[in-house]
Amino acid sequence: FLFPLITSFLSKVL
């Protein structure tokens, strides 16, 4: 799974 992508997405959301 694309963990880096999820982290980036969460960072934008938060």
From Swiss-Prot:
<dbReference type="GO" id="GO:0005576">
    <property type="term" value="C:extracellular region"/>
</dbReference>
<keyword id="KW-0878">Amphibian defense peptide</keyword>
<dbReference type="GO" id="GO:0042742">
    <property type="term" value="P:defense response to bacterium"/>
</dbReference>
<keyword id="KW-0044">Antibiotic</keyword>
<comment type="function">
    <text>Antibacterial activity against Gram-positive bacterium S.aureus (MIC=130 uM). Shows no detectable hemolytic activity towards human erythrocytes.</text>
</comment>
<keyword id="KW-0964">Secreted</keyword>
<protein>
    <recommendedName>
        <fullName>Ranatuerin-9</fullName>
    </recommendedName>
</protein>
<comment type="similarity">
    <text>Belongs to the frog skin active peptide (FSAP) family. Temporin subfamily.</text>
</comment>
<keyword id="KW-0929">Antimicrobial</keyword>
